[in-house]
Amino acid sequence: MKFEDNEMTPSMENTINTAVIIEKPKKTTKSINSEIFLDPNKTKVAVLDIETSSLKSDFGIIICAVLHTLGTDEKYKVCAIDLANKDLLSEEKALLEVLNTELENYDGVVTYFGSRFDIPFIRTRSLYHGLQPPSKKRSLDLYFTVKRTTNPTSRRLERINDILRISDPDASPDKTRLGMKEWNGVVFNRDSKMLDYIVEHCIADVKILENAVWRFKDFLPERIMRC
């Protein structure tokens, strides 16, 4: 499975005034300025979304994952389970091996409620399969920026996208819906059409999220922390 890229001692007779430059080790910080975080020339950031068979990671599996490098024209990286394999757990493990490796190529990640769902889900499922979870990264969870700066009736990504599309309908796609039919169709019926629908939904969510990041740029935290 893969994604679809000296010391000097002066003489007593002739003392020389010498300035010794000591190179200090670079200081590593747990946070980064948000402007640097958003600049693709300085920081490589993944916009991430996953789709799962359950909201809880002890009973559910990851069906697909989509990554896009923030602020670039790179292709969307998609990884999904293969329904032709009877062992979906082995498929999920293979997916995670690819996803975790790919995430290590990034300096940071953008999600929507991902600090509470996507990232913990990936970590839990990785531990389940005996895999090393992705390392801590600078993480922007846009949900909490939306929560802090707006007051719509719902803070779901779908509603935020609806609001943003009123003034600029071409900036992001309309958000599709997922329900019992799609999830059950994949997990219990191994319906490839349903899986394709879920993958397209996941890609659209990443596009919507990336657009929202730029629209909320002025309201982001001044520093992006690791989590």
Give the location of each predicted region.
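Acidic active-site catalytic centers that drive phospho-/nucleotidyl reactions
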Residues: 49-51, 118, 141, 205
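Short amphipathic alpha-helical segments
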Residues: 59, 122-124, 214
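N-terminal accessory regions of nucleic-acid-interacting proteins
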Residues: 1-44
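Two-metal-ion RNase H-like nuclease active-site motif
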Residues: 43-54, 202
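Acidic, metal-ligating active-site segments
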Residues: 51, 58-71
